[in-house]
Amino acid sequence: MDIKRTILWVIFSMSLVLLYDNWQRANGHASMFFPSATQQQAASAPAASAAQGDVPKANATAGAAAPAAPGGAPQAAAQPTGEKIIVTTDEVRAEIDTAGGILSRLELLNEHEKDGKPVVLFERDTTRTYMARSGLIGGDLPNHTTVFTATPGPRTLDGADKLEVTLTADKNGVKFVKTYVFHKGSYVVDARFAVTNDGTAPVSPTLYMELARDGSKVEQSQFYSTFTGPAIYTDADKYHKITFDDIAKGKASTPAATTSGWVAMVQHYFASAWIPQAGKEHSFYVQQIDPNLYRVGIQQPLGQIAPGATVTTDARLFAGPQEERMLEKITPGLELVKDYGWLTILAKPLFWLLEKLHGFLNNWGWSIIALTVLIKLVFFPLSAASYKSMGKMKDLQPRMTSIRERHKGDPQKMNAEMMALYKTEKVNPLGGCLPIVIQIPVFIALYWVLLSSVEMRGAPWLGWIHDLSVPDPFYILPIVMAVSMFVQTRLNPTPPDPVQAKVMMIMPLVFSFMFFFFPAGLVLYWVVNNILSIAQQWQINRMLGKGKTAAVAKS
């Protein structure tokens, strides 16, 4: 039996490793065993190019990714140069490059890095590329390689509720006007596009709006991963993540043309999205532009424009933090960029409850503690049933050991006698595991709530914990967690299998090492959960002890 248990433990451990590796790859991270295409490109390619001569081709068929080769207009010998317009609101500081009318830099003024500087979402330099672009396809028309002229006007809100930046370009008889409207207290920029045919023949342009980004991860951790890459949403196909690796391998696909949905670039805590005008038919595309540069976009045909006529259309550009309630109000499905994985059905109500607790306590750290306590109380009956079953199994250990010794040469007879013993004593050998298994998805869902919630960024708890989204600077919480895990292990019945016993002794050390690098909010959750489990186990053992004493007294 011992060798069988050892084999089962090996299989179980390997399954966990493979599941973890699959989770890593699902989030666009590298496999632990095989280098991905994006890994190999990142190793061999220079920094992501910020070249602008990569105008997309019109989509030939809906539902297919754009070809990997750059298409469209011929590339100029030198990159165009334009004016950098700096727009400042109460939420963002944006840089608009008139060379292409591109949003080439965006700082989130109320979200800060560890050094206190604003988070930079859009950026274009020699080391990083992430920008929002738009233009026209259909002949040599104004696009994101064309130099625009900016209309003079205010560049800061200065008490106003909104400000507009208007850019104009004329090319081959077509005038293209982009107007960006920035609003007070908002991460949404309204985009108005007007196309005028100043020529003598009809034109049929297609408007494109895209997000271009290098394939580098914002964060790197060996112990937890979050998705970085494009995403597409439609009413029919719902939320669809696309990994950079799939784009590089030509495996990416996009939904069919529709009148709903949006495209986004997603990373930990933040996202950007182009949201086209509702009711206008459009198609989607994803593409690898350079070895480490990718894009996701929308193409919207504007129909035939007669000479002298003008066609207008609107869109919205979101760029900001993944605040769930804010995203829900912008457009259907946008809150899904906050990725809870396959446990969304559990994670969303848990976050709702966490928000409610924060409304009372006004501190995310205490809210995490309160939520963990509530969950423990809800599951207390299941835990009591589990410990009761394990207690019965412990009482049967001497008789089970005797059966194993008597029939160690006859596994079939040994198993039959074991089952007879379970039936006689009314014990379910899985009774101690099933209640715990039921609880596991809830605790995993809470783990992902805490990992993905931007509200934890910069949120203090008490004393030395000034930011629940970064590791404990003094490693106090991981050490407390190690001690609590060790105590919890000692309180549990010693497994009869020596291999299991060794694993149970080593686990506190392994987990403690991992949690040294985890965000403090996650470690706080595990510490509180462990301490409550110890208290719960003591109380249940006390209750079971009283029950045994009463039973002995009656007999």
UniProtKB/Swiss-Prot annotation:
Keyword Iron-sulfur: no
Cellular localisation: Cell inner membrane
Topology relative to the membrane: Multi-pass membrane protein
Location of the region described as Disordered in the Swiss-Prot/TrEMBL record: 61-81
Keyword Signal tagged: no
Domain of life: Bacteria
TM region(s), chain numbering: 7-24, 341-361, 364-384, 430-450, 468-488, 503-523
GO biological process, one term: protein insertion into membrane
Pfam families documented for this protein: 60KD_IMP, YidC_periplas
Keywords: Cell inner membrane, Cell membrane, Chaperone, Membrane, Protein transport, Transmembrane, Transmembrane helix, Transport
Family matches, as InterPro entries: Membr_insert_YidC, Membr_insert_YidC_N, YidC/ALB3/OXA1/COX18, YidC/Oxa/ALB_C, YidC_ALB_C, YidC_periplasmic_sf
Complex formation: Interacts with the Sec translocase complex via SecD. Specifically interacts with transmembrane segments of nascent integral membrane proteins during membrane integration.
HAMAP family in the record: YidC_type1
Known function: Required for the insertion and/or proper folding and/or complex formation of integral membrane proteins into the membrane. Involved in integration of membrane proteins that insert both dependently and independently of the Sec translocase complex, as well as at least some lipoproteins. Aids folding of multispanning membrane proteins.
Entry protein name: Membrane protein insertase YidC
Species annotation: Cupriavidus pinatubonensis (strain JMP 134 / LMG 1197) (Cupriavidus necator (strain JMP 134))
Gene name tied to this protein: yidC
